[in-house]
Every structure is written in structure tokens, then in C-alpha cells.
Amino acid sequence: MALTSQSLFFSPLAAGPSRRVRGRGRSTSVSAAASASSHNSQPHGHPQQPLAVASSSSKSESKGSKTFALASAITAAASGAFLLASSGGGFGGGAGGPLGGGGGGWGAGGGGGGGGGGGGGGFWSRIFSGGAAHADEKSSGDWDPHGLPANINVPMTKLSGLKRYKISELKFFDRAAGGGGAFTGPEDSFFEMVTLQPGGVYTKSQLLKELETLVSCGMFERVDLEGKAKPDGTLGLTVSFVESVWSAAKQFKCINVGLMSQSGQVDFDQDMTEREKMDYLRKQERDYQQRVRGAKPCILPDNVRGEVLGMMKKQEKVSARLLQRIRDHVQKWYHNEGFVCAQVVNFGNLNTSEVVCEVVEGDITKVEYQFQDKLGNFVEGNTQIPIIDRELPQQLRPGHIFNIGAGKQALKNINSLALFSNIEVNPRPDETKEGGIVVEIKLKELEPKSAEVSTEWSIVPGREGRPTLASIQPGGTVSFEHRNIYGLNRSIVGSVTSSNLLNPQDDLSFKLEYVHPYLDGVDDRNKNRTFKTSCFNTRKLSPVFVAGPNMDEAPPVWVDRVGFKANITESFTRQSKFTYGLVVEEITTRDETNSICTHGSRAMPSGGLSMDGPPTTLSGTGIDRMAFLQANITRDNTEFVNGAVIGDRCIFQLDQGLGIGSKNPFFNRHQLTLTKFVNLNKQEKGAGKPLPAVLVLHGHYAGCVGDLPSYDAFTLGGPYSVRGYGMGELGASRNVLEVASELRIPVRNTYVYGFVEHGTDLGSSKDVKGNPTEFFRRVGHGSSYGLGVKLGLVRGEYIVDHNAGTGTVFFRFGERF
């Protein structure tokens, strides 16, 4: 009786007695073993542990096979160098080759039985499970000579059960090759199916178990293991085989069987009558076809299916080697796309026109959160789960297939909360739902309250320019933070700073800020708005009132701002956000004696000071009060490619005066900044890959319509404006335009770069009250060019001031763009 269809099942079974099923009108001993992927998809350095693959019709043997397949995949992935640090945390999981086997086998022959046999399991699972034969590690250097005449063939049954045999040679002999048979080379995928290794030491029972595994795995029509006595006392082994072959197929179907329940099994009784056997096989056929119809289609794209069909058309019949190549090809696509838990667990409908490839894709069934203390003990966390859960990408939620890219994104998103010192995202098999994946997220929370004190010392020159003991001034900053209030990621941050703690009233500055995220509720994931309010007192040196390059140094003017700010930030995407709010502040201008300063001043040739400079405030009294609306739109698509910033960034800011305050100020200030980082050599992103060559293009425009106090005029010159000039050295104006270009060339894991920059006031300096650009003899425009090198966080640059034609060396911290 010929069978209409057959199936190959791959289960994580240890080698055991071979099972025989009736197929093709004869009794067939089915056996198969799995090979590692030939596409380098297995994690580097991961040991290829053996998995036995056997045919079975027992439901008990098939139960849990899909869970085992996923466990094997996750184990291999976790050992595959895909541990991603995130604030000290890591991401368990990675890509591997055929990451274990098992899973999904169901019937005895799957609707036709025979040939491929039965119970659930994994065709390739022997790579990661306990294998049939392992070298005795304790006695690997202590083995027994065979004690037989040299160069005679020795059946395994004739070996002594008391000896440990050293294997010096392993060969494969294909009986069907070339008509009379031929030895195959290491490139043959069958080489990877055995666990025996030359140089290993094995007992007779281990060798017999290896043979039984090969016999029972379904890959061979016939297989035998024979030894040859070597003169040095070792054994050479030859595996002679005839691979299994099925009829030609013209169609290929891929289904996801990950969460499908196991079918009820009925043992195939060899004592059945012919009619009972026929009824049994028909029932298996109906059950399997119903299973195929009820399965979800796999996510394998059409072009990969077409490639598999092309592989099938090149061969007249479906062979075990062809199925290995199909398995490798399918799993390679899954693993390359980040679906590291996907496993090919079965090929069904063999001996028909359509081959069915069953895949356990790694469906996520649930997400679990675990909090740990500093010692790794599980504790009750302070952070509310919805705060973390809303940061998970959609692809990492139940109902989706586990993907390592989604795991990386989850790490990045959760880390952006700044609530945890350690984050781990680990997939594991679901023990309650066979074939499912549980995403396990382990978190270590930061201390909610913290305080910090930092000190600094400054020396003020005394008489005759020499410092004295009394001129030493202690300064410092006291800061505190209470984060994650009520577990809702709300926080209060404060700091107090003074450069002279002996007389802190001279320059005491402070900031107190409250942040309230999820303004529309934690559960509303369609909106992400954060409310922030702060009160502040700051002091900065104004670059508006500085002397030009051909003047003596002008007396400095300090700008104090004390006020209140409240705004709402709405995140449209992780790259785009919109901030809008209200600012109320009092601005006071002071001279170096801390007295209120109403006008700028400059040194006269006589040594005196000219006090008729531009007014420092809009009111002319040295004190302004105003309220204005402020909005900011940021679109940042930059990313790090091997340590270099690539992408584009756009920032638009608008300040709108309300006519409230000193002299009823009404104005519109606007700024637009565009920066693009171009990957010139299209360097791909990846660990260990070199830095890309980068071209930076930058432009900045700012303008003001309406009332414009001098302290808010736009200045030209400085390390973040036009390099090579001092802060404000080129001018202060109502409108400015800056353009810059920088070419970065990677040299030994750092950058050497050249740049050119230009800035102009567009002729608007005269429109600033008192014209500080003219008063301080500045030109209103300037260019520079130079070369630089990055030394860690420091930029060393040689810059030519194009206005004066002189060059200067600068060292700066941070980035220009």
C-alpha cells in the first residue's frame, strides 16, 4: 500500500530504540539528525551540542517539544554575544543558526504516516539537546587500545563494553553516489549530524546510541556505523548511508504552528488489520489537512518562498539534503530579520505535490516585569507598571512575534525614563502555553532621593595683580533631586550655586523645577504630554557689550534673570516634539561691582570710560520686567552609526511678547537652525565596523520684529557661532545668518576634520538701540576656516580668522553642532 503523504518530524529526544512504521508497502526504519546552519547564523563560539531526533507516534513524547525548541533558540541566542548594555543592563537574546530543534510534531507520519514518522519534535534539534554520544571528558586523555589485528573492519556489536575507544578518523560513505557509492567531504551537511569527533574517547554503549539515533531520525533509508582497527590502537569510523528520498513537489507552503495545540495521538499498532490500517492513515491524513488549514500563515515573504521553489525545481525529487537546505534558507531569513526564536520544526505532506514547512515563529504570549535590589533579589518595585509598559514597542507585545530589534528598542525606550540603573529584556519559553514566548523585563531602580555638593575655589587678584590669602573665594553648588514621585515618574529637582560662599548675595543663583509627565494620563498612549514648571535666578556675562578686536577691553556687563517658567512638551514621535509655554522674568543688568548698570561703556584714550554707550535694558533703568509666550519645535532624526552622528536636525523657536511689563514690550523673536550629517561612504552600522566619513552642513537664522532689548540682541562670534572669534566679537544685531560646513575623516578611531564658517548681521546692527556693534567697533560679519582633531571629549583646532588673517590654536570641550 502506497502512502499519499509523509511528514518528517524533528523532536528533542535522546537516542533510544528505533521505531518502525509501515510505509511505501514496506517496513522502514526512519532516522534523522539535525545539522547546524551552513550560513554562519549560529552564534560564534557556541558549542554545537547534540540533539537526538526520532520518529514517534506517542503524544507524551511530543508534548513540550515546541517549548523545547524555543528554549533551545533562546539559549543559543543568549550565548551569541547579543548582550546589550543599557545603563548597566543587557538584552538576553541574539541571532543564531538553527537555534535548537523540537517543536510541533504531532502524528505518526502526519496523515499518511511512515517515512517521516511521528511525534512532535525538531528535525534539527539534536544540535542543542543532550546527544547520543559524548566523549568521556574525564578519560579523554586515558583510552584503551582496541587489541585487534590492524586494518580489519569491526562491527560495533563486536567491541568490548569495558574499553574506552579513541576515534582517530571519521568518514561518511554515500552508497547511492555515483552508482557504486563514494565518500563525501566535510562540506556534506550530514557531517554535522553526528556528535562523534575525531580525537574523542567513547564507550561501546555511546557508539551504539549514536547509531540508534541515526537509524531513528528519518533522514536515511539505511545507515550503518562500522569501525576499522588502526595500527596505533585507535579506531576509524565510517558512516555508510542511503539518504531518504520522496517524490517531486511543485508547491511550497509555510505555516506558523507555534501556538497550535497538540493533536491527540493513537499508537500505530502493527497488529492492525489492513482495513484498520487504512482507516488509521485516512484519519491521520484528514487531521493533518485540517491542521494545515487551521494554522496561521508564516511571515516568510513571497520572494523567499520563490527562492525555495527554485531550489525544489532544480531537483527531480525531494531529498533529505534538500530539506536541510530549505530549513537553513528559511531559518536564515528569520534570524537575519531579528526573529531569533523562529524554528523550522517539521516538513509535512512529503510524497505529495506540496511540501508544508511548519515553523514555530516565537509568538509572544505575555510580558512580565520583575524588580530587583542591588543584590539581585526580587522585590516590590516603586515604579507603576503602566509607566514602563507604555514604553514597549508594539512588536514586543502579546500577539506579535519576538524580534531582537524590538527588544533593543525597548531597552532604549525604558532607559530614556532615567529611572533604572540596570535593565534586562529576556525572552523565555512560556511554561503554561506551549510554543509561546514570555518577554521577561528585569529592572533595578535608582534611589528616588539624592543630594550632591560640589565645591570650587577661585582666586581674585589683589593689589598689584598678586593674589592674597584673603582673595581666595570658595564657591560651590548644592543640588538635590526627588525622582519618580508616587511611582509616576514625576520629579522635583533643585540647585543653588554661588562662586563666593563668603558673600553669596553677590551672585547667588538657583533653580527649582517640577516635572509632571503623562499629563493626559498614563493609559492614554495616543498622547504624550509633559508639564514642567520652574523658578530660576541666573547670571551670565553679556556678549553684547564686549569690545571689538581693535579696542581695549570694555567693562563687563552681567545680566541677571529671575523669574518663572511653565511649559508643556508634546511628543509627536520619538524624533519630534513641540514645547509651548509662558515665561515671566525680571532682568537686571549689573557692572563688575554688582551695581545696576544702565548703559554700556568703553575705555577712552585718556584712560577714562565713556558712559554714553548703548542702553542695557529696554526701560533704560537697568531693570526690565516682561512676560512672553515661548514655543519650540524640534525634529531630530539623528542616530549613532559606529559612534558618529548621522542624520538631520531641525529646531524652530519662537518668542512672542505680550505687551506686559516695562514699556509694554511687544515683539516676535524667531530662530531656525538646520543641521545635516551626511554619511559620505555609506558606512553600515555594526559592532566593530569603522567610523564613517561625515559631511556636516549647518545653517542658522535668527530675527526679531518689534521691541528688542540690547541683552536679547543676536550676537556673532564664538565657539558655537563663528569659530575663531570671541563671544560677540563680530557684532550684535536684530537679524543674523550663519552657515558652516565641516568634513570629518576617520583616522584611527577618531576624526580629523576641516571646516569653514561665515556669519553676517545682514546689515541689521544699526537697528539695535544704541548700535552696540558700531559703539564697540565691530565689523558685523566674519569668516573663518581651519583644521581640527577630536581627542576624546576635547576638540583641538587651528583656526584662521579671515578678517585679520591670523591663526590661533583653540581647545574646546563638547561638540560644535
Swiss-Prot record:
Residues 157-164, 242-254, 373-417, 444-449, 481-507, 570-577, 702-713, 792-805 are cytoplasmic. GO terms for biological process: chloroplast organization; protein import into chloroplast stroma. The keyword Plastid applies. It is found in: Plastid, Chloroplast outer membrane. It holds the Pfam family POTRA2_Toc75. Residues 14-59 are annotated as: Disordered. It is a multi-pass membrane protein. Residues 136-147, 174-232, 262-364, 426-434, 460-471, 517-561, 586-692, 723-784, 814-817 are chloroplast intermembrane. Mediates the insertion of proteins targeted to the outer membrane of chloroplasts. Required for the import of protein precursors into chloroplasts. Forms the voltage-dependent preprotein translocation channels (hydrophilic beta barrel) of the TOC complex in the chloroplastic outer membrane. Belongs to the TOC75 family. Transmembrane regions consist mainly of membrane-spanning sided beta-sheets, which are not predicted by sequence analysis tools. This is Protein TOC75, chloroplastic. The gene is TOC75.
